A protein has these predicted regions:
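Active-site beta3 strand of CheY-like receiver
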Residues: 40-46, 51
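Acidic catalytic/metal-coordinating carboxylates
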Residues: 29-32, 55-58
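Short hydrophobic/Thr-rich beta-strand motif most characteristic of the beta2 strand and flanking loop
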Residues: 21-29, 36-37
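Alpha4 helix (beta4-alpha4-beta5 surface) of REC/receiver domains from two-component response regulators
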Residues: 58, 78-94, 106
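C-terminal output helix
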Residues: 14, 81, 99-108
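Two-component/phosphorelay signaling modules centered on CheY-like receiver
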Residues: 7-25
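The feature encodes the CheY-like receiver
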Residues: 10, 52, 79
């Protein structure tokens, strides 16, 4: 699942991931993401941190309470404290925007194994 409030970024990520054979669901806010997590199972959640109705921290914490899942933070926040906070919230990986798609693909491969 991809959780991103910026429509263009969400569209590009969804197309690229689909092109490389990943099944995806998309959400543009925390509430939508949490509703989707209630009804579907995922291997990985890719989530922005800053969402209009909450945060990616909340999304990954609640998603991990529902199912065994890997989390990838996709964010503009790239300081050491931001990375630490992502890990504490439950993210397994932290990628700073702009995201290197090859790095993201390697992480998805690692997360899926």
């Amino acid at each position: 699942m991809v959780v991103e409030d910026h429509a263009d970024t969400l569209r590009v990520l969804a197309r690229l991931l689909d092109h490389f054979g990943h099944e995806i669901s998309v959400a543009d806010c925390a509430q939508s993401a949490l509703e989707i997590v209630e009804s579907k199972e995922f291997d990985v959640v890719l989530s922005d941190i800053g969402l209009p109705d909450g945060s990616g921290y909340e999304v990954i914490a609640q998603a991990k309470r529902k199912q065994p899942i890997k989390g990838v933070a996709l964010t503009g926040f790239d300081k050491e404290e931001d990375i630490r906070r992502s890990k504490e919230a439950g993210f397994d990986f932290h990628l700073s925007k702009p995201v290197d798609f090859h790095e993201l693909c390697m992480i998805l491969t690692q997360a899926g194994s």
